[in-house]
């Protein structure tokens, strides 16, 4: 099945290891299939992104070990141009159709959205709850801000935003913005930028948390 052309936008706690966890570990795959997305080819003259970004999919299992989280993670596609970004975004299920406890992530380069990854371990996330009727809007706006490097001036000189995530939960959904250096969070204006981008959204339970402060953090191994 050929992918339809991309629609260009206007300019501008972990469960103990066991059979139940193993049975639930498989994350859903986009209906078009990862194989078809892998067949995407950059278009001549495509607008390059400042950095490549990788879409990931997973399903969070309370109590899962770091190894189980890593094995549950599914790479969707690494995008390097604006056109390929929209081709992928438009051809994976909308976040509103994902099952409970599933998440999408967009991470810089090909780094994985795992707390204990060496390149992530000293960082953390800004985390906020989103009303379900606003999830799609918030996720899309954060994606565009991320690939457009709109957070570049919102982090300290030795820090950077390296990813965004959206997770489907019971009452409200959860969005997260990842940075690489938790010790410099006091100098960041990431939340101010998010409020500027989404002035009409009422976020709940907004806070920052270093990965190393999670009770399930397995330092040196490798999830959100």
UniProtKB/Swiss-Prot annotation:
<comment type="subunit">
    <text>eIF4F is a multi-subunit complex, the composition of which varies with external and internal environmental conditions. It is composed of at least eIF4A, eIF4E and eIF4G. EIF4E3 interacts with EIF4G1, but not with EIF4EBP1, EIF4EBP2 and EIF4EBP3.</text>
</comment>
<keyword id="KW-0810">Translation regulation</keyword>
<feature type="region of interest" description="Disordered">
    <location>
        <begin position="1"/>
        <end position="28"/>
    </location>
</feature>
<dbReference type="GO" id="GO:0006417">
    <property type="term" value="P:regulation of translation"/>
</dbReference>
<keyword id="KW-0694">RNA-binding</keyword>
<dbReference type="InterPro" id="IPR023398">
    <property type="entry name" value="TIF_eIF4e-like"/>
</dbReference>
<dbReference type="GO" id="GO:0005829">
    <property type="term" value="C:cytosol"/>
</dbReference>
<feature type="binding site">
    <location>
        <begin position="169"/>
        <end position="174"/>
    </location>
    <ligand>
        <name>mRNA</name>
    </ligand>
</feature>
<feature type="compositionally biased region" description="Low complexity">
    <location>
        <begin position="1"/>
        <end position="27"/>
    </location>
</feature>
<protein>
    <recommendedName>
        <fullName>Eukaryotic translation initiation factor 4E type 3</fullName>
    </recommendedName>
</protein>
<feature type="binding site">
    <location>
        <begin position="115"/>
        <end position="116"/>
    </location>
    <ligand>
        <name>mRNA</name>
    </ligand>
</feature>
<dbReference type="Pfam" id="PF01652">
    <property type="entry name" value="IF4E"/>
</dbReference>
<keyword id="KW-0648">Protein biosynthesis</keyword>
<comment type="similarity">
    <text>Belongs to the eukaryotic initiation factor 4E family.</text>
</comment>
<dbReference type="GO" id="GO:0006413">
    <property type="term" value="P:translational initiation"/>
</dbReference>
<dbReference type="GO" id="GO:0016281">
    <property type="term" value="C:eukaryotic translation initiation factor 4F complex"/>
</dbReference>
<keyword id="KW-0396">Initiation factor</keyword>
<dbReference type="InterPro" id="IPR001040">
    <property type="entry name" value="TIF_eIF_4E"/>
</dbReference>
<comment type="function">
    <text>Recognizes and binds the 7-methylguanosine-containing mRNA cap during an early step in the initiation of protein synthesis. May act as an inhibitor of EIF4E1 activity.</text>
</comment>
<dbReference type="GO" id="GO:0003743">
    <property type="term" value="F:translation initiation factor activity"/>
</dbReference>
<dbReference type="GO" id="GO:0000340">
    <property type="term" value="F:RNA 7-methylguanosine cap binding"/>
</dbReference>
């Amino acid at each position: 099945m050929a992918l339809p052309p991309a629609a260009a936008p206007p300019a501008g706690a972990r469960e103990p290891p066991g059979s139940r966890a193993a049975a639930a570990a498989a994350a859903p795959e986009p209906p078009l299939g990862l194989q078809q997305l892998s067949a995407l080819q950059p278009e001549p003259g495509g607008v390059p992104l400042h950095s490549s970004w990788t879409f990931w999919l997973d399903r969070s299992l309370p109590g899962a070990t770091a190894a189980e989280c890593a094995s549950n993670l599914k790479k969707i596609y690494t995008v390097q141009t604006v056109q390929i970004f929209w081709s992928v975004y438009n051809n994976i299920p909308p976040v509103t159709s994902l099952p409970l406890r599933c998440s999408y992530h967009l991470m810089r380069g090909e780094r994985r959205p795992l707390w204990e990854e060496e390149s992530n371990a000293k960082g953390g996330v800004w985390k906020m709850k989103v009303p379900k009727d606003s999830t799609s809007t918030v996720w899309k706006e954060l994606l565009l801000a991320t690939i457009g490097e709109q957070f570049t001036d919102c982090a300290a000189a030795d820090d950077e935003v390296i990813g965004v995530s959206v997770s489907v939960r019971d009452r409200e959904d959860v969005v997260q913005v990842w940075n690489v250096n938790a010790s410099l969070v006091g100098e960041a204006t990431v939340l101010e930028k998010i409020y500027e981008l989404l002035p009409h959204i009422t976020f709940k339970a907004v806070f920052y948390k270093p990965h190393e402060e999670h009770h399930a953090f397995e330092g040196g191994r490798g999830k959100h």
